[in-house]
């Protein structure tokens, strides 16, 4: 594999995010990189892909900047680009929690746990493990015994915690996310809310999966990633599939977006059921006039109507 995917972040001060984004985009394009980078006055949050040579040059360039000299990059090998375009965008926050009173992780954040320390927390019955990711990320893969917040956006997590506070009161709470950036701010918010014993997996699931001692132990399923790969393996000790097909409930790790462009819901579905149900999550979406699956596969009107009847069988067996 001659390509690499980089995942990184750093909370620090960028005085002029708009100018930084403009200059950084030019640099990335000049080095043929592709990906998504968010910058704000609170720091940088990025994931990008390129050849090994190009990504090594990028990391060297960042480490040569005093502001980023100690920034940690999580590196995955890849067979090609994981993104189609290159975006660098200025934002209010590098991870959107939308709090009335913002949290600065440089001053307030949970205790950092190494992969080995986190594994011990997973083995401790008195510790509550909270997955700080979205529900569709959890459903593809998660740590054994972790609590699944019923959210589709990170900014909804604080409200969910408030509604379910009884689950965590007076307990040791450990949280985790993909690369660590969400937990930096989320664990800080928990401390501000009065929770006292708060810790986080330092470097996230991505770091845990590459640790030579833990080897991803106690992770079930695959880790969702926000690029063209969709998911990556984490557990090197044992392989489990926990995802379930949207239609028949069989083991599945294949995510697609609903073919209705006005829906776009992410569902786990086999290739067989994607074809059977026209790439849609429901009858309403399957019959939508702009169904992308129908268009991409040049399905005739007669065949379209025929496949719509598959939803009748689905309801009969529900």
Swiss-Prot record:
Cytoplasm keyword on record: no
SMART domains: RHOD
Keyword Oxidoreductase included in the entry's annotation: yes
Reactions catalysed: uridine(34) in tRNA + AH2 + O2 = 5-hydroxyuridine(34) in tRNA + A + H2O
EC numbers: 1.14.-.-
Domain Rhodanese: 123-217
GO biological process, one term: tRNA modification
Entry-linked CDD domains: RHOD_YceA (cd01518)
Active site as annotated: 177 (cysteine persulfide intermediate)
A GO MF label: oxidoreductase activity, acting on paired donors, with incorporation or reduction of molecular oxygen
Keyword entries, A-Z: Oxidoreductase, tRNA processing
Superkingdom of this protein's organism: Bacteria
SUPFAM superfamilies named among the record's database cross-references: Rhodanese/Cell cycle control phosphatase
Stated family: Belongs to the TrhO family.
Functional summary from the UniProt entry: Catalyzes oxygen-dependent 5-hydroxyuridine (ho5U) modification at position 34 in tRNAs.
Name of this protein: tRNA uridine(34) hydroxylase
Species in which this protein is naturally found: Staphylococcus aureus (strain bovine RF122 / ET3-1)
């Amino acid at each position: 594999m001659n390509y690499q995917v980089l995942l990184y972040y750093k909370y620090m001060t960028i005085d002029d995010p708009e100018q930084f984004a403009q200059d950084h985009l030019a640099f990335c394009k000049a080095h043929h990189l592709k990906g998504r980078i968010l910058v704000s006055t609170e720091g940088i949050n990025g994931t990008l892909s390129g050849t090994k040579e190009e990504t090594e040059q990028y990391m060297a360039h960042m480490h040569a900047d005093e502001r980023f000299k100690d920034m940690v990059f999580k590196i995955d090998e890849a067979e090609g680009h994981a993104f189609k375009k290159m975006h660098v965008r200025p934002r209010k926050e590098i991870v959107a929690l939308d709090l009335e009173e913002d949290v600065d992780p440089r001053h307030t954040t949970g205790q950092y746990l190494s992969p080995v320390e986190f594994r011990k927390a997973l083995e401790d019955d008195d510790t509550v493990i909270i997955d700080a990711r979205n529900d569709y990320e959890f459903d593809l893969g998660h740590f054994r015994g972790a609590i699944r917040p019923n959210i589709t956006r990170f900014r909804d997590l604080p409200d969910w915690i408030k509604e379910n506070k009884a689950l965590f009161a007076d307990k040791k709470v450990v949280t985790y996310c993909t690369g660590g950036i969400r937990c930096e701010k989320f664990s800080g918010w928990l401390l501000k809310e009065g929770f006292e014993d708060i810790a986080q997996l330092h470097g996230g699931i991505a770091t845990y999966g590459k640790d030579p001692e833990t080897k991803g132990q106690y992770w079930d399923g695959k880790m969702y990633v926000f690029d063209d790969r969709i998911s990556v393996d984490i557990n090197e000790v044992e392989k489990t599939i926990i995802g379930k097909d949207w239609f028949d409930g069989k083991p599945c790790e294949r995510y697609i977006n609903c073919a209705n462009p006005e829906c776009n819901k992410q569902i786990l579905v086999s290739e067989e059921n994607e074809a059977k149900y026209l790439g849609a999550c429901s009858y309403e979406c399957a019959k939508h006039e702009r169904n992308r699956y129908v268009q991409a596969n040049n399905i005739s009107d007669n065949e379209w109507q025929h496949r719509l009847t598959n939803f009748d069988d689905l309801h009969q067996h529900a």
